[in-house]
UniProtKB/Swiss-Prot annotation:
Complex and partners: Interacts with LASS2.
Amino acids binding Ca(2+) 3: Q240, D242, E253, N265, D266
Role, per record: Mediates the endocytosis of plasma glycoproteins to which the terminal sialic acid residue on their complex carbohydrate moieties has been removed. The receptor recognizes terminal galactose and N-acetylgalactosamine units. After ligand binding to the receptor, the resulting complex is internalized and transported to a sorting organelle, where receptor and ligand are disassociated. The receptor then returns to the cell membrane surface.
Residue stretches spanning the membrane: 41-61
Descriptive protein name: Asialoglycoprotein receptor 1
Gene name linked to the record: ASGR1
Organism: Pongo abelii
Sites carrying sugar chains: N79, N147
Sequence ranges assigned to domain C-type lectin in this UniProt record: 161-278
Miscellaneous comment text of the record: Calcium is required for ligand binding.
Biased composition (Basic and acidic residues): 1-19
GO terms for cellular component: membrane
Binding-site positions, Ca(2+) 1: V191, E197, E278
Keyword vocabulary terms for this entry: Calcium, Coiled coil, Disulfide bond, Endocytosis, Glycoprotein, Lectin, Lipoprotein, Membrane, Metal-binding, Palmitate, Phosphoprotein, Receptor, Signal-anchor, Transmembrane, Transmembrane helix
Length: 291
């Protein structure tokens, strides 16, 4: 009986093993369940904690570096601002000093110009006085040579014609310079009032461009001594004056001159032409005024 029971139990075990082999191995547990079980969960938590700690340390280090750089930038900006303010203040001070120096120099320059103007006026008076003295002396010499007979006379190197005295240049000047030269001689640029005077002047100037005392720089044509132009003598070339602008020297033609044939033409006042000065005979021989 016992042996039979043992055989049945052995057979039952074999059938049980055979049944398990037919069913296969037991199903495996999910990955998350295995990770969250026991020691594995502890290790995972520890790893995440370490990773978080590393991230916090890195961020803290970077934040510290950024704050350090920000402090450096603030300090640099503060120094730059202070330096700029100091430079601006220095430039402002220098500008004030330069302005004061410029005002001082302007005052000195104005004073020097005033002194030069006064000296120039005084020099012109002395020159005119010298010219008058020279004319008076020449007339006195002429009177002595004429056995004491008193008569009006022209200065030395001046030519007498019809109660006027004429001086003919041998060099060239611009019209304004020639006009000033005649004024210093207590005379004026020649004013032609008749055909006889035209022929006289033309005879002495020859075929050379020569300035006369006629211009239209301020509007209408006029003579420098106030002689009426509209009703007076004229000897213009055909189609003159034309106030031509094509010469390339700027402006028109505002000053009159004798041409090579004696007739008149208007031209640029800056051209260096010869000129003729004229003064009245009685004026040339009068006694100089006392200063």
């Amino acid at each position: 009986m016992t042996k039979e029971c043992q055989d049945l139990q052995h057979l039952d075990n074999e059938e049980s093993d055979h049944h398990q082999l037919r069913k296969g191995p037991p199903p495996s547990q999910p990955l998350l369940q295995r990770l969250c079980s026991g020691p594995r969960l502890l290790l995972l938590s520890l790893g995440l904690s370490l990773l978080l700690l590393v991230v916090v340390c890195v961020i803290g280090s970077q934040n510290s570096q950024l704050q350090k750089e920000l402090r450096g930038l603030r300090e640099t900006f503060s120094n730059f601002t202070a330096s700029t303010e100091a430079q601006v203040k220095g430039l402002s001070t220098q500008g004030g000093n330069v302005g004061r120096k410029m005002k001082s120099l302007e005052s000195q320059l104005e004073k020097q110009q005033k002194d030069l103007s006064e000296d120039h006026s005084s020099l012109l008076l002395h020159v005119k006085q010298f010219v008058s003295d020279l004319r008076s002396l020449s007339c006195q010499m002429a009177a002595l040579q004429g056995n004491g007979s008193e008569r009006a006379c022209c200065p030395v190197n001046w030519v007498e014609h019809e109660r006027s005295c004429y001086w003919f240049s041998r060099s060239g000047k611009a019209w304004a310079d020639a006009d000033n030269y005649c004024r210093l001689e207590d005379a004026h640029l020649v004013v032609v009032t008749s055909w006889e005077e035209q022929k006289f002047v033309q005879h002495h100037t020859g075929p050379v461009n020569t300035w006369m005392g006629l211009h239209d720089q301020n509007g209408p044509w006029k003579w420098v001594d106030g002689t009426d132009y509209e009703t007076g003598f004229k000897n213009w070339r055909p189609e003159q004056p034309d106030d031509w602008y094509g010469h390339g020297l700027g402006g028109g033609e505002d000053c009159a001159h004798f041409t090579d044939d004696g007739r008149w033409n208007d031209d640029v006042c800056q051209r260096p032409y010869r000129w003729v000065c004229e003064t009245e005979l009685d004026k040339a021989s009068q006694e100089p005024p006392l200063l």
